[in-house]
Amino acid sequence: MERRTFITLTGVAGILAAHRAPAFAQGSKVHVVRWVDFIPEADVELKRQAPEASKALGAEVQFEFINANDLQPRITAGIQSGSGADIFQMLYNWPQLYANGLVDVSDVAEAVSRAQGGFYDAFDAAAKVGGRWLAVPHSTGGNAVAWRRSWHAEIGLTEFPKTMDAWREAGRKLKAKGKPVGQALGHSFGDPPTFAYAFLWSYGGAETDPSGKRVVLNSKGTVESVKFLTAFWKDACDEGGLAWDDTNNNRAFHAGEISATLNGASIYIVAKRKKDTIKDEKGEPLWQDIEHAAPLPAGPAGEAALYVPFQHAVMKYSKNPKLAKGLLTWMHQKENYGKWFEVNEGYSVGAAKAWEEHPMWAKIDKPLQVFRRAARKTRMLGYQGPATAKATESYSKYIIVDMYAKAVQGMKAEDALKWAEGELKKIYEG
């Protein structure tokens, strides 16, 4: 973003022109809560930038990093109590759910979008409510199936299966060799829902019709998807995945316990950065045996993907909303955002399209290139309807994830679907 835009947005043109920091009240502070990143160096970079931002803004900048599964409880508690962090990281379309507690940040968001090639469509669905930006789009977490090249070669495969049926057959052979697929299907923010929703869509299933007002989950495609996953789970998967969160599959892959898993780029990146300690069964660096396939293998209705849009929202209860917006503007300046972006190596990609052309993409390893345009391909929670607060509520209650989890634990496919349909009707039609 141009410096002039930054000055205009923060309303401190005269002060910065005089080479002084903005004159916020003495002791002013902006507190940002984000997840603990799966790329540790990304958090290190933000911590490094905090003093620079503090100097630029003339106020203290504090980053706090917490487990991603604790973000929603903290956001809810802050809104209910009227106190807490000034800025929260938002995932998916959470701004829809918390709209009444968020500041309009359209001035910041629109300036970033104009300067950086426009935001991806997913962010309009995620962070715009009633035509207003209630969070500033920050990045997208893509996902892909990380898979062991050598293990798949043992069963005659040189590329990853293209269809769910082919993946089930490959997984069956690998599980028989003690090398199962590993899939998180517990209550966790990322891997379970990004798998479950994409899987549902690949069979033609959806929560609602395009209006978002009528539940249409009970369909032939959904029933088939539940039945297939039940068989896939038994034939191909590590069945302990029912209790996994977003960290378990990373650890299992690095430990050589699973052959493939849907994940972001972190399994590869961390394995390479810790090549001296993360090794395969032959004692060689594990990263050399990792490939990525994206999106998930196709179901009867084709391929589908759910990636994770990230945004930052300023809370209405904040005593320093102008300062908070100033920080978001500063964070999105090209030189500041670019340093954070490069550290990620494709794990988190830009929210704006200009970052697809960043020189980093010419330098990073081929398995990471699959994430370059990930944000163009994602659907949003609520598909095939709009990404409303009701869609976020459904996600937050893990209804689609639990439909599959109940089935793989022994509930009849039709009964698991009926349960999920009933829960969705309480939200969408109640």
What are the functions of these language-model segments?
Residues 1-13:
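N-terminal secretory signal peptides and thylakoid transit peptides that target proteins
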Residues 27-38, 60-64, 86-87:
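Short, well-ordered beta-strand elements
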Residues 29, 60-61, 100, 153, ...:
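Conserved C-terminal helix/tail region of periplasmic/extracytoplasmic solute-binding proteins
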Residues 39-60, 400:
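Short, polar/charged alpha-helical segment
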Residues 91-144, 195, 285-295, 363:
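Hinge/lid segment of periplasmic solute-binding proteins
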Residues 93, 266-287, 299-399, 429:
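C-terminal lobe and pocket-closing loops
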Residues 130-138, 143, 168-215, 221, ...:
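Extracytoplasmic/periplasmic solute-binding protein
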Residues 171-173, 211-243, 296:
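Glycine-centered hinge/linker elements that transmit conformational signals in sensory
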